[in-house]
Amino acid sequence: VDSAAAVASFAPGTHGEPFTVEALLQNCDDTEMGPSCTFYAEGARWVASFGYKSNDAALEYMKTLPVNAPMIVSGDQISMGDITVEAAVSKAEPGQRDAYADQRDAMQGDWVDESDAKSTLRVVGSEETASYDGQQTAVSVLGFADACPGGDSIGPVVWKQEMGGDPMDTPCFALLAVSPTRMELSYVGRGNTLVYVRP
């Protein structure tokens, strides 16, 4: 790790509301904001652009990491949309794997609904793309916790928030079983179980 990545490049509050979050790397790529790194923390999608207020050494460090790598990221919030935060990253360093890392890892990749082969999911990092008969239907952010938003602790759950959807609409599923070959989710509040297998 370039030591400059872990040294704050500006004082907290320089560019907006300061933050320090435990984050998961999504990717570093060209986005709607130019070359940038995207990470997930606290249920939001955070985007930091190269050459714009951030510590580029910290973003270069992110570029070396695999998807879902845990990080501790500090900086300032420049602006916030529905679920996307434009961030100025001051520093980034390695974080600890969280309690849901194994389930998150097992969920990565392509899945087919056992009861309807036209219904598919692709999980990459903290993003899930749902498709039906080859047509993309939704892209959602996945969050892992031991309780649904506003609910009781019931053990590991995954909640989904559709990008561009209602921020209050977060369907939540109990993780009944997640292995590299099979995923069983129970829709909390509706009770139906969804089973996905590998294609």
Segments and roles (model prediction):
Residues 76-81:
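Short, charged beta-turn/beta-strand-edge "cap" motif at the junction between a beta-strand
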Residues 14-16, 62-64, 92-112:
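N-terminal helix-cap/turn-to-beta initiation motif at the start of protein domains
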Residues 16-20, 32-34, 68-70, 106, ...:
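Extracytoplasmic
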